[in-house]
From Swiss-Prot:
The lineage of its organism: Bacteria, Pseudomonadati, Pseudomonadota, Betaproteobacteria, Burkholderiales. InterPro entries: Lgt (IPR001640). This is Phosphatidylglycerol--prolipoprotein diacylglyceryl transferase. It comes from Paraburkholderia xenovorans (strain LB400). Keywords: Cell inner membrane, Cell membrane, Membrane, Transferase, Transmembrane, Transmembrane helix. Catalyzes the transfer of the diacylglyceryl group from phosphatidylglycerol to the sulfhydryl group of the N-terminal cysteine of a prolipoprotein, the first step in the formation of mature lipoproteins. Its main location: membrane. It is found in: Cell inner membrane.
Length: 301
């Protein structure tokens, strides 16, 4: 059984300024996106479409705005709408936390539509170019969550070699024991709690790094090395992320203010299902269009 390292959330102290790890991970995410994007410029079919390093820089500007605005508004609307409607000024307190990937995804999508309009490109051509740049950023964000010791997983069997004790979850663990006496007895969790005052949980942030970050990066990296029908790379991203997130949510602790929703699924799972379905539909449309219009259907990504 492992114990979370309980990192200091502040990475660097610069006089009165405190640079937090989570904020630093945003910087890492955008630097990684620049690196991956410039590597993609070396692909002959990408270069032939006229993409440049300046395009990447401009897209990231749009992407930063879409991520922050969409991520925050998505969290407000999807997760704590009643609270923020009652306390609207708290919406602007982003330093207190509260970002949603699905909201950020919608924000970035709208930002890329605007970028495509201004550059007179197809928006699917733009999202196909951007999609392989995203997983490294997702991994950085989840690493920030892990360093902060937040968004931990559900309680699990302490005999699992990956089971981890999260100090931040300790206030909820006594209530969990009272609510799940059978599992507590089966996994001998009362003894564990008596010794550590915490319960073992899935390190779900690390699962997300592995699936949404590493695995999805390599899937998109190899899939996009050669020309694909326009929309296909975006579709693979939607399907890949949706499946990864839907799967990890079974091990991730649901938000305490929402719990599990219909059919025993979490909010993250319900928001991921449309991504999977839209991705499948887009993939089918993409290849059917390529067969009908082979000369025009190849993506620039």
């Amino acid at each position: 059984m492992l114990i979370h390292p309980n990192f200091d959330p502040v990475a660097i102290h610069l006089g009165p300024l405190a640079v937090r790890w989570y904020g630093l991970m945003y910087l890492v995410a955008f630097i990684a996106a620049i690196v991956v994007g410039r590597l993609r410029l070396r692909l002959p079919y990408v270069a032939a479409q006229g993409w440049t390093a300046k395009d990447i820089d401009d897209m990231l500007f749009y992407g930063v705005l879409g991520t922050i605005l969409g991520g925050r508004l998505g969290y407000v609307l999807f997760y704590k709408a009643s609270f923020y409607f009652a306390h609207p000024l708290d919406i602007f307190k982003v330093w207190e936390g509260g970002m949603s990937f699905h909201g950020g995804f919608l924000g970035v999508t709208l930002a890329m539509v605007l970028f495509a309009y201004q550059r007179k490109r197809s928006w699917l051509q733009v999202t196909d170019f951007v999609a392989p740049m995203v997983p490294t950023g997702l991994a950085a964000g989840r690493l920030g969550n892990f360093i902060n010791g937040e968004l931990w997983g559900r309680v699990t069997d302490p005999s699992a070699p990956w089971a981890m004790l999260f100090p931040g979850a300790a206030p909820d663990d006594a209530a969990w024991l009272a609510a799940h006496p059978q599992l507590a007895a089966q996994w001998h969790l009362n003894e564990v709690f008596a010794q550590y005052h915490m319960l073992p949980r899935h390190p779900s942030e690390l699962y997300e790094i592995a699936l949404e970050g590493v695995a999805l990066f390599f899937v998109l990296f190899f899939f996009s090395r050669k020309p694909k029908p326009m929309g296909a790379i975006s579709a693979v991203f939607l399907i890949g992320y949706g499946l990864a997130r839907f799967t990890v949510e079974f091990a991730r602790e649901p938000d305490d203010f929402l719990g599990l929703l219909a059919m025993g699924l979490s909010m993250g799972q319900w928001l991921s299902l449309p991504m999977i379905l839209v991705g499948i539909g887009l993939l089918v449309w993409s290849y059917r269009r390529a067969r009908r219009e082979p000369a025009q259907a190849v993506s620039a990504s």
